[in-house]
């Protein structure tokens, strides 16, 4: 293979090329000392509906890398100038040598330049009485910025560039070398990636520097863009799609946070994401705020974190408000035009599965091409690369591979590898029907679940104590700190598909209480090699003070009974023959809720309590209840 290396002293060639291609100087210098391939190649190469790896594109020595700043339509940092987002581009040399125009895989993130890491010293103290203002928290540690120009990140490059795609990264507002402030949701986190897509399609301005600089054009872009990413990086593609920006053809969000209220609250209750007790939206702001100089950071901290987030997040009541409304992408989903492949896990207790299910359902209703990939693991986990390939190849290269036809739901079964999902026409399973079961008393031991309601009023009482983990309470044979009701052993496996729903009539001896509900599979598997699906079926949480409205808490009248009804997290799981399905009701969930002083009593009226289970086939096969 012929390699041509220009002399260092051939600066006339360098700057002539820079002017012609409108590239940053750094990028052209990189190109100037890089080898050049001879002969033209065909891009893309498609086989069986997928873009294939092209040998000539695998060698990173033949990639062009450069960075730039794209101008947005907002000024968050108060300097009187429109904020610019830091963007990096990695593309095949053939975009210059053959003047190719290629589609783009775009990934945006607030994490590229670093975070506060595992330091949780500045998190909120969960030891808080319900309804009280939280104790003051500590200041967050400084972020040691990572990354060097022109490379922001190398994620996705090896997967997609050799298949004939340009890969683009950008840092979110207020992070890395992007200007502005983090807003953690809200308009700017949608408008920032929109600006980058507009630049890729020739509608927005790009520059070689964060201030001033020479114009940069994406002359190598075909104007067709796909986005993907996981967690926060999966939220941003959805945010961009809600703007309806032209050129964004397809997104594959993985475990996206689609509502910051649903991330930090649950049915009016302050409920932390799994593994991050004490985190709230202001904590996440500090976690990612790696951008700006000292003066800019102070401005952002004051005007965004303190005046907006800390003033409106409301850790005292957990109520919904306009601040949270503006950070819920379901409220903007009507703007989505791009095709969407949602990916999530049913046992993700960080970003719980409702985040993707609610968007999937709304997009289906709106007639947007959408499919769902779900697995049985925890947070993260993209679809198989072959599935993603088919989506990107279809929507970005126009290949008629039938990806939009056929099954709409792809679910990895309990014992299968994530690369081998099972196809279903839709989610939930079309044959799933609600089966209602009712509790029979047994406290402080275990009661039963049966398919007939009680004919006489019976109550049982539990005593709140956050000291005990939910896993401990579920396994306990005898405790006053939870109520638990189980089916008889299943005579056949039961396939749950959909969203369980709980109805409770309860009274409390205090004006406020946490309410937690778990569905569990018993007996509990205590083996070291147990899987998460062996024990936890699903969970849910709610604030009894928000029975009438999510926007306004009303103190409970001690001793008065209230009816409360809410969804648990969506699921699709097969409960094995011989297991029992258990409904556990308790108050404070040690790993998720606030930790008020123990001792609050919740009394449940069993005659007016029921659980609705979405069962494929519509029946639960039970052994004799005698």
Swiss-Prot record:
Gene Ontology MF: a single term: aminopeptidase activity
The UniProt entry's GO biological process terms, in alphabetical order, are: proteolysis
| Active site per the UniProt annotation | 231 (charge relay system), 348 (charge relay system), 379 (charge relay system)
- Keyword set for this entry? Aminopeptidase, Hydrolase, Protease, Serine protease
InterPro entries, alphabetically?
Answer: AB_hydrolase_fold, CocE/Ser_esterase, Galactose-bd-like_sf, Pept_S15_Xpro, Xaa-Pro-like_dom, Xaa-Pro_dipept_C, Xaa-Pro_dipeptidyl-ppase/CocE
Instruction: Tell me the enzyme class.
Output: hydrolase
Record field: catalytic activity: Hydrolyzes Xaa-Pro-|- bonds to release unblocked, N-terminal dipeptides from substrates including Ala-Pro-|-p-nitroanilide and (sequentially) Tyr-Pro-|-Phe-Pro-|-Gly-Pro-|-Ile
Q: Does the keyword DNA damage apply?
A: no
Q: So what EC number does this one have?
A: 3.4.14.11
Stretches assigned to coiled coil: none
The protein's matches in Pfam families, at most eight in alphabetical order, are given as: Peptidase_S15 (PF02129), PepX_C (PF08530)
Q: Which family does it belong to?
A: Belongs to the peptidase S15 family.
How is this protein named in the record? Putative Xaa-Pro dipeptidyl-peptidase
Organism source for this protein?
A: Rhodopirellula baltica (strain DSM 10527 / NCIMB 13988 / SH1)
Which taxonomic lineage is given here? Bacteria, Pseudomonadati, Planctomycetota, Planctomycetia, Pirellulales
